[in-house]
Structure formats: C-alpha cells, structure tokens
Amino acid sequence: MDLFEYQARDLFETHGVPVLKGIVASTPEAARKAAEEIGGLTVVKAQVKVGGRGKAGGVRVAPTSAQAFDAADAILGMDIKGHTVNQVMVAQGADIAEEYYFSILLDRANRSYLAMCSVEGGMEIEILAKEKPEALAKVEVDPLTGIDEDKAREIVTAAGFETEVAEKVIPVLIKIWQVYYEEEATLVEVNPLVLTDDGDVIALDGKITLDDNADFRHDNRGALAESAGGLDILELKAKKNDLNYVKLDGSVGIIGNGAGLVMSTLDIVAAAGERHGGQRPANFLDIGGGASAESMAAGLDVILGDSQVRSVFVNVFGGITACDVVAKGIVGALDVLGDQATKPLVVRLDGNNVVEGRRILAEYNHPLVTVVEGMDAAADHAAHLANLAQHGQFATAN
C-alpha cells in the first residue's frame, strides 16, 4: 500500500523523525485555516501518489493564508498523470541550506535491504541515478542488524557527507530505519532530507510503501487505507476484493492471473502502444492464480470504473483458474454493468478449459468483447482500440 505524503509525514513524526508541521485539507477554506494555524510562510502540496507534482503546478508557495486559499483552489481537482487531486497538505515553510536523498527498500535479489543515500537530493532519484550514478551511494543492510550507529556512519561516509553534517544526519537515518522496520514497509524514501539554515536535519518530503502481507499485524492499516482517502476509490474497491491493483497513467486496462503474466502483459502492451499513438497500460491488476468468476467480475468492475481506460485487455492462462470460470466472470460482470459497460474488451484465453471458455464468450456474443488468439495479437488489438477511442472514434471490440 502506497501512502500519501501527509500519511508518511505522520508516521515519521510518530517514530521521532524530525518533520515540519503539516495539515491536510480538502477545501480552499480548510487550507486557509491551516495556513493561519501554522503561521508564516507555507507550502501547499497536492496529495497524489505519483511524482512530478512540482512540474505540474501541484506545489505552490503561499506567504499568506489568503495565498494558501488561492493555491489550494488552483490545485484541488487538478489532474496529475491521471490522478485527481482531492486533498492538499499545507506544510510549514523551511529555510533550506542543503538537500539530501535517503531511502531504504527491499532488495529481493540479494535477500536483504538496500539503503541509498546522496548529498545531492531534491531531484527525482531516477534522474540522479542516470545522470550522476557516482553521486548515489548504495549500502546493503543486514535484516538481522538493521541500521544502527555503525551502519548509519557507513552510509553517510559512502555518500560523502562532511563530518559535522554527518553527525547530525546519523541519528535521523536510524529513526527512518525504525519507521521502515517497525511499520513493515517495503520502501521508505525521504527526498529531500534537508539541512536548514538553523542547522537542523528535517525530513521535508516522504514516500512510504507498506507491505500488505503484514496488515494483520498492524491495527492502523485500516485507518491508513480509508482515512481521508488513504486509497482512491478504485484502489479501495480492489483491496476489499483481495485484488492486487496498481493504477498507472495509461489507457489500456490490464487484467491477468499471476503477477508474472501481468508484468509481461504490461511490457507487451507498452510495445504495442508504440505502434498505436503511444497508448500505455492503465494499471496492474492480478486476480490471482486461483481466481473465481467473482474475482474476475470484481476486477472488471474496478478497471471499467477508471475514466482513463479506453480499452481492456484480459489475458488469462488457465491453470488452477480455468478459462471457463474466467469467461463466466466476464459474462456476469457485463450483465451487472449493463449499459454502463461502454469500453471494448479484448480477451485472450489459453490453457485449462480454453475451448469451453471461448465457447461461452462466443455464445454470449457481446458487441464489446473480442476473443483473440495469441498475446501479441491481443495486445496489439487492445492498443488499437484505445487509440481509436482517444481520437473520438467509437469502436466495439469487434
């Protein structure tokens, strides 16, 4: 589960990571009151789970409460990479002397954790890693010992911190590790971690991804998911139906069974999209290896509820999940949705009970559904239909 910035900030504060005051607001008037409460210079920041907020105009400095009102009024309702801004965080301003980068993530390949740190923070980490890879220190963290003072010192030394600053950064890194470990996260990122003019080290912006498999051990997970839109409507609907769903910024909805197949589907749709107007995957949705007709129907309900989706590619290889079960789920979902189903579906079935699955869909003969043999051909057709829809040409799947 990805958290909003304000939720990450609250967890940081709970674990003693130094942060500035921040208040979440869902209306311009609430933002104005928040700015008054904080006092002085504030920054109004869009709360969305994608990068690039600043470039999109989603982060604005507000010297007065009236300007905080205006900033929130401009930001709320904004679309940033397919994500609608429903909330802003009004944050206390800071006099920044230096910006750093720090993150901890799960390193599955090496069965350990990886700490990444740089004295050049503030920019997107992908850009830093590409343009100045030598500026990004990477230090393996033993899961059994974590980040203690010795490990934190190793990290700041590798990153090239000056001695005086390093002594201030070390205790903050240890606190950030406590957030990662105690909250059972798979990613904690602070960008930037700043040194203020007063000499304080503060986590100015944070990103946290929590391990959903650990939800049962944490009483606060339900509140994080639902409080103030902790998940958007589609994510919440997927979570309630035990579907693995991640919203992306494309136009071709993806449903598959098994994470490996879905990941491959994302790649092949992206490649097909290059031939059809730059269409890209709209999501990752895995209904699971033992999916039922109900989970298939729930998955379709989620995808068809995304306004960014122009076509849907259902890619299933029948194993434990038989193709006829998937077909029945598609039929059931379309029956329930009725006239609300307006987006073409391209279905590729293979494996267990594929003949019966194709027969069910052929007899159903829905104008929005096309069954295509072969993953390449199906992905190409789904991208083609999304491209047609983008240019205002209504098209059924057939």
Swiss-Prot record:
Pathway: Carbohydrate metabolism; tricarboxylic acid cycle; succinate from succinyl-CoA (ligase route): step 1/1
Binding, Mg(2+): 191, 205
Residues binding ATP, per UniProt: 45, 52-54, 94, 99
A cellular component annotation (GO) from this entry: succinate-CoA ligase complex
Ranges of residues in domain ATP-grasp: 9-237
Entry EC number(s): 6.2.1.5
Keywords of this entry: ATP-binding, Ligase, Magnesium, Metal-binding, Nucleotide-binding, Tricarboxylic acid cycle
Binding-site residues, substrate: 257, 319-321
Annotated PROSITE patterns: ATP_GRASP, SUCCINYL_COA_LIG_3
Signal peptide interval: none
Catalytic activity field: succinate + ATP + CoA = succinyl-CoA + ADP + phosphate; GTP + succinate + CoA = succinyl-CoA + GDP + phosphate
Pfam families: ATP-grasp_2, Ligase_CoA
Database matches in SUPFAM superfamilies: Glutathione synthetase ATP-binding domain-like, Succinyl-CoA synthetase domains
Any single biological process term in GO: succinyl-CoA metabolic process
Record field: transmembrane: none
Cofactor: how bound: Binds 1 Mg(2+) ion per subunit.
Function of the molecule: Succinyl-CoA synthetase functions in the citric acid cycle (TCA), coupling the hydrolysis of succinyl-CoA to the synthesis of either ATP or GTP and thus represents the only step of substrate-level phosphorylation in the TCA. The beta subunit provides nucleotide specificity of the enzyme and binds the substrate succinate, while the binding sites for coenzyme A and phosphate are found in the alpha subunit.
Entry similarity comment: Belongs to the succinate/malate CoA ligase beta subunit family.
Quaternary structure (record): Heterotetramer of two alpha and two beta subunits.
Name listed for the protein in its UniProt record: Succinate--CoA ligase [ADP-forming] subunit beta
Organism, scientific name: Corynebacterium glutamicum (strain ATCC 13032 / DSM 20300 / JCM 1318 / BCRC 11384 / CCUG 27702 / LMG 3730 / NBRC 12168 / NCIMB 10025 / NRRL B-2784 / 534)
